[in-house]
Each structure stands twice: as C-alpha cells, then as structure tokens.
Amino acid sequence: MAMRAIQQIMLGTVSRTEAEAAETLKRIKNAGYDGIELNGFMIRPTPLIVRYLTKMAGMPVGRGGKFNWKRLVSEAGLSVTGIHTDLGGLEREPENIISEAKKYDTDKLIITGMYRFDYSNKDKVKTLAKRLNDAGKRMKEEGITLCYHNHNAEFLKVDGKRSVMDILIEETEASNLGFEADTYWAAEAGVDTIGFLEKLRGRIKLYHINDRGTKLSKPTFTPLLKSDSMELGYGNMPLERLTEIVLSENVDAVILESHKNWPEKSPLLSMEMSAEFMKKYVR
C-alpha cells in the first residue's frame, strides 16, 4: 500500500516554532496521513535567498532548519518518504546527503529541478541527463533510489519535437533514475496528464498530487478566470484515474503538495479537506 504523505513545503507558516511544528505534524497524522516528504533546505539552516524566493512564490519555508525534525517526525508517528535535495550539493558532498537520508530512514532522494539553468539548451539538457544518471548510479551503491521531480520547465520543446522530459527519460537508465511525477505542473504546461504518466510507466517511484481549478468569492467582471492549486477533488483534474495509474505502478507514496490558494489561508485546513480524497482513493 502506498503511503499517504504531505510535502513539507506546505508547513512553513505553521511550523514557526518547534512546539508548533510538533502540533502541526500530529494534526497531519490525525487527518489520516502516514508520512512526510522533507526538503533539505527546510531541515538544514536555510539561506536567506531561499527563504526570499519561496516567500515570493507564495510558499514561505519558515526558519525550521534548526529544529530536530527527526524527533518531531518520529513522535508524530510519521515516516519520511524521501528528501528533496539539489543535484550540485549531491555531487559535491554525496557522503553528507547519504548520511542525512539514512538518519531519516529513507531510501529516496529527489532532485527538484535546476535553478539558473537554460532548459532551452539541448546540449545542457543532455548533460543534465548524464549528471542525473551518474549520480543515480552512485546512490544505487548505497541502497538509495535517486528520483527527478518535474515542474513545468521540463515540458519545454528543445528541438521542435522532444521535450526536456523526453530527453531525461530516454537518456537515463531506469536502474539509475526514477521519477517523482507531478501532474499538476504537467497540466499547467498544457500536457495530457494521463499520457504523461503512461510515458513514465516503470519509472514512477513517488507521486505528487494536487488539483487545479478556480475559486470564486464574488462575481467577476470578465469570464477570464485564473486557475490555481485546489484541494483534491475540488478542481478539474482527472485525479481518480491518475491515482489509479500510479498505484498500479506500486509507488511508495502519494504526496500532497498544495502550493497556495488555501481556504482561510490555512494549509492545515487544506490538507484536511484533501485527506478525504486520499483516504478514499489511496489505499
């Protein structure tokens, strides 16, 4: 059975102190979730630039880098499904990242895309594929599965036909690199989400789930509305079918990541609303 989990990025505004983080994790457990996916930049001291960029994106990470997350997660009765990290850090200090993964009893490390990177440059994308393949081979020696997590940049066409994602799939070995599929970002890029998962069959290790749609609180002046993150089952994505596909792939975890647009600006209320879908379809 796949774990029902939460992405730590949702918790920045409700983990301002260690005591608050403990209460937040207990509430997550009580809502029916089994695990949490951690971010390296949230369990280590967080650089100012990271706090600034995530805040500007509507996802403040807080100052929890000094908290004892190992104890907090364990006391809440949750398991760690994996740790998000960056490729450069993994290449420079593999021993430290490996040690961190083992400390949290997880065998999954996830590369969350590239920053200050030209996704339109085919040669650079091909080099990225090689770097991921090499890093994954190194992690495999330690009993760790390396995964790549997509956003929307990976659906950019780099040669008129193939997308960045196509190259990452085709030019890496399945034994060295798995994928943490995120269909919200595929939908945002205009991609057929079901077709995307079908293309990844055999390599999906983790699944990020989110819904996409529109919330209205008052009449609008025009019929042009902005889509955004939604609680599971409240938007327009074919989540039942998408979940069916990833469960047939025996993913280790289905991980909720609602970025923002939360009811009453509360990520906890949002995750509790999404828990109803998770309990019904992720089992």
Description of each model-found segment:
Residues S79, H84-G178, L268:
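Active-site acidic/histidine proton-transfer and metal-coordination neighborhood
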Residues L11-T13, I43, T85-G88, Y115-F117, ...:
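Solvent-exposed loop/turn segments at secondary-structure junctions
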Residues V14, E18-A21, K55, M59-G62, ...:
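Flexible, glycine- and charge-enriched loops at secondary-structure boundaries
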Residues M1-D34, G40-M42, R51, M165-A181, ...:
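Histidine-acidic metal/acid-base catalytic patches
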Residues E37-N68:
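Glycine-rich, proline-tolerant flexible connector loops at the mouths of alpha/beta enzymes
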Residues M42-P45, M114-Y119, T214-L216:
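Conserved radical SAM core fold
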